[in-house]
């Protein structure tokens, strides 16, 4: 049964930070694992680094190809005694998410497997002392430490950047969409993977800017010049697999050549990508021209910029995004003469902590926006839905059209990831943003006289910029964050649509803990969450301000019969957070460009000029009670 399989998987993930350097001798290894074990244990595995990725791919392909579940577990158990710790978790997670006989099984949360990537080193140190000083206590709880102070204005946003949920989401997204995914080897296509790479990261940047404005800071300034000195950042994390700290970055450093790639390569790749965008086509490795058209252009570009194995010409266009992460992570020790750990930018489960992550991704996003500029703005015909009119939009919460945000406490279990030498439970108490429950109320008139199938799209954006000027539609468009997207059948006449925030198509509702999974909770073959991928529910709404920050809530209904994609399976598995994560083994269930209608430039100077009858815009306030 699924529960039995889940129980057999769990021990593989326990106490990985305590593995020794000894490896299984070559003659005792399974033939299929002869090529792995190159990256030493204790090294920080990076799924942005080409060499690390190549070995990880060899491992997950071997695990994916195991003939049955017993064989799979046998291979995993061997691999655990051979390969690098981080690579092991990455490869096993990719295999579990994609093997048919693993449907319904959930990989334990990464924050419990490697708590050292999420919890400050000082806090783990204190937990260690408490555990050894109180061996008789059943459970120990320590408070998470602060990692900075207000001398650094960016510290105001640490609640967002260092949030455990969003960092875990980023890790999971890159497991669902590995850069080295090869459809011919794996036998499955990843629909619109390149476009999803663009959209998911664009949304993270839009969310970050909303948080900045909530805190009275200006929107971020994108990275744009490969020689520019970067701001400083100190992660306060120590990797327990090596005992080395994640490198801090003093202020004023700029990126340097690495042994694998030069800064000049990055400059050249950027120029080539921008040339391709201006010419509206790329050149593949056989010198054929492939157009960057409306339907596939963003997807093709996403594969090239990331770059993934589906890049049409990696020799020519390089791997701009991935090497950018690696260069920034190795900024203080580019040639490894001091044998330091890289910084947090090297790893998907830690990179969101660093302010440069967002500035780097806005730089990447600006390249995509150049491509989007080559298309005409949406016409009224493309935006409208004849016969359908949105009459009213409101938020139903304690106070109408006001959403309250607050700081909540949660606990994270450390003892599965860290071996404290006792059986007791050791937990960290940490604080995170959250919001009160609310529902959307949308009143729609269907004047067509017939039933209509609609897709309801809900977005949110700040109304004013940092200087309190009203944002113009084209400037505001890149700040719109998707809150929900769902199907609704409109009966003729008046329809009142009520939708709970918990049903959002971007968030994951519940993350099962190590203990719950071990006890078989929530384990079933038809679970709908793409298996732990999704924006955390508690971070759905930006923080807002104490006096109530003004946002605009945008609702649009489009014709579902035109949006729908052929060949979708009836009951998609893992489709809880479909907007950011897609659905498992299925096509992306919306034909429109991701981010529609805000993915192309808007020429209208006012909202009234842009709006069509099937859209609604309403002012709401977000109030922070901190």
UniProtKB/Swiss-Prot annotation:
Q: Which GO terms describe its molecular function?
A: chloride ion binding; copper ion binding; oxidoreductase activity; oxygen carrier activity
Superkingdom classification of source = Eukaryota
Give the multimer and partner information.
Scorpion hemocyanin is a 24-chain polymer with 8 different chains identified, assembled in hexameric substructures.
Keywords (A to Z) from UniProt: Copper, Disulfide bond, Metal-binding, Oxygen transport, Phosphoprotein, Secreted, Transport
**According to the UniProt entry, which residues carry Phosphoserine?**
374
Q: What does this protein do?
A: Hemocyanins are copper-containing oxygen carriers occurring freely dissolved in the hemolymph of many mollusks and arthropods.
Tissue range of expression? Hemolymph.
Mostly located where? Answer: secreted
Residues binding Cu cation 1 are 170, 174, 201
Mind telling me what this protein is named?
Hemocyanin AA6 chain
User: Where is the protein localized?
Assistant: Secreted, Extracellular space
Give the matching PROSITE patterns: HEMOCYANIN_1, HEMOCYANIN_2, TYROSINASE_2
Consult the record and explain the modifications the protein receives after translation.
Answer: Three disulfide bonds are present.
Tell me the InterPro entries matching this sequence: Di-copper_centre_dom_sf (IPR008922), Hemocyanin/hexamerin (IPR013788), Hemocyanin/hexamerin_mid_dom (IPR000896), Hemocyanin_C (IPR005203), Hemocyanin_C_sf (IPR037020), Hemocyanin_N (IPR005204), Hemocyanin_N_sf (IPR036697), Ig_E-set (IPR014756)
- State the family named in the UniProt similarity comment for this chain: Belongs to the tyrosinase family. Hemocyanin subfamily.
> GO cellular component terms?
extracellular region
Annotated residues that bind Cu cation 2 are located at: 321, 325, 361
What is any Pfam family matched here? Hemocyanin_M
Miscellaneous information on this protein: The two copper ions bound each have 3 nitrogen ligands (presumably contributed by His residues) and share a bridging ligand (possibly contributed by a Tyr residue) in addition to binding oxygen.
